[in-house]
């Protein structure tokens, strides 16, 4: 088996793992919403969309046969992570400055108008405020954990692309 095939397999395993982690994070958010009664705000929902896009692009990328198609989907994963960084970063900033609102009046109709809000309202419909402080998990707020996950994704996926493309094929 050539080094090219080994690197591509490693990348695909990484993408599958990333997709599973993103789906687990969405599942955790749904658990906190339904069981712990923590209502999601517009920025929480946008972070769920980013996680969902990362998972979808990661799974599709892992199923692609060639190096170029895998790289294309890894690029889409990175772009989705950057969108998640924007939403989570804004959410962290709002939690640090509770006097400023995330503009629920402005964002709520936009987020609730997205297709998944009508198809799966429990998971993708806004029902809370961004300034609501929920108990931290291991010392960090959920928005801080999400920001950490998005930053790691936005750094590790391109690093994987660069590292594996430097290898001679």
UniProtKB/Swiss-Prot annotation:
Cytoplasmic-side positions: 1-14, 66-72, 164-169
Name its GO BP terms in alphabetical order: protein folding
Example GO molecular function term?
protein-disulfide reductase activity
Give the CC-aspect GO terms. plasma membrane
Q: Does the keyword Cell membrane apply?
A: yes
Query: Which residues are listed as membrane-spanning?
Result: 15-31, 50-65, 73-89, 145-163
Cystine residue pairs: 41-44, 102-130
Topology in the membrane? Multi-pass membrane protein
What ranges are annotated Periplasmic (topological domains)? 32-49, 90-144
Please verify whether the record's keywords include Electron transport: yes
Q: Where, per UniProt, does this protein localize?
A: Cell inner membrane
Q: Which Pfam families match?
A: DsbB
Give the PANTHER family listed for this entry: DISULFIDE BOND FORMATION PROTEIN B
Give the family, as the similarity comment puts it.
Belongs to the DsbB family.
The name on file for this protein is Disulfide bond formation protein B 1
Question: What organism is this sequence from?
Answer: Pseudomonas syringae pv. syringae (strain B728a)
Q: What is the lineage of its organism?
A: Bacteria, Pseudomonadati, Pseudomonadota, Gammaproteobacteria, Pseudomonadales
Q: Which gene carries the instructions for this protein? A: dsbB1
């Amino acid at each position: 088996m050539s080094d090219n095939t080994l690197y591509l397999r490693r990348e695909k395993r990484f993408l599958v793992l990333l997709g599973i982690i993103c789906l687990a994070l969405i599942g955790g958010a749904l658990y906190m919403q339904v069981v712990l009664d923590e209502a999601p705000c517009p920025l929480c929902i946008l972070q769920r969309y980013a996680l969902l896009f990362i998972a979808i692009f990661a799974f599709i990328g892992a199923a692609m046969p060639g190096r170029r198609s895998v790289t294309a989907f890894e690029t889409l994963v990175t772009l989705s992570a950057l969108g998640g960084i924007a939403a989570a970063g804004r959410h962290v900033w709002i939690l640090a400055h509770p006097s400023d609102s995330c503009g629920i009046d402005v964002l709520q109709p936009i987020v609730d108008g997205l297709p998944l809000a009508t198809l799966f309202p429990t998971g993708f419909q806004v029902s809370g405020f961004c300034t609501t402080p929920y108990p931290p998990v291991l010392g960090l707020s959920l928005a801080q954990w999400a920001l950490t996950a998005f930053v790691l994704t936005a750094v590790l996926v391109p690093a994987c692309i660069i590292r594996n493309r430097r290898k001679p094929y």
